[in-house]
Amino acid sequence: NNHIYSMPVEITFSDGIQDTTVTIIIDSLTNSYHIPLLMLPTWMALDRNEKVSDAIVANERIITSTAVVIVNETNVTLYVQNLGVSPSLVRIEHHFVPPDPFLQSNPGIRLSDYHYWSVNGNFTNGFLTKGLFVYDGSTNGTTGYLDNTFITGSEDSLVFLYRPGAGFNWQVL
């Protein structure tokens, strides 16, 4: 396969105080970059300003108080329990592609064939929130077709899975 392309992609690095955005050029199936920074980043985001057309809907919120926070376009609502020592930045990404498969066999648990979420950001010490992630197994024309192929039988055994990042196995929360 000959891939001839040159796609600029922004990477934003943050230490919770300062953000630095750099543009890299993706020009092959695999690339490696060395990016010198004048800070120690605690968080990074790829294509934060959504300039690349992909299968992700993302939204960020700066949390400044305990409240119910609707994260628009992501089908997630946060119920902030504790603000922590200062405001936190929360980024929700709703990926409209299947998640990576289990690394090890996990009988009886099936991953969505359609979507998953990732949650990251700059979380200050003491920050605590609960999240409501919308599951919709209906075929309603307005809000449905999100999970209609996921569970075709009883929906009484739905579990929420988590992994700290790629290369880790999914685990039940």
Region roles according to the model:
Residues T64-V172:
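Self-processing/autoproteolytic domain segments and adjacent N-terminal interaction modules in large
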Residues N1-V90, P98:
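Non-catalytic accessory/interaction domains
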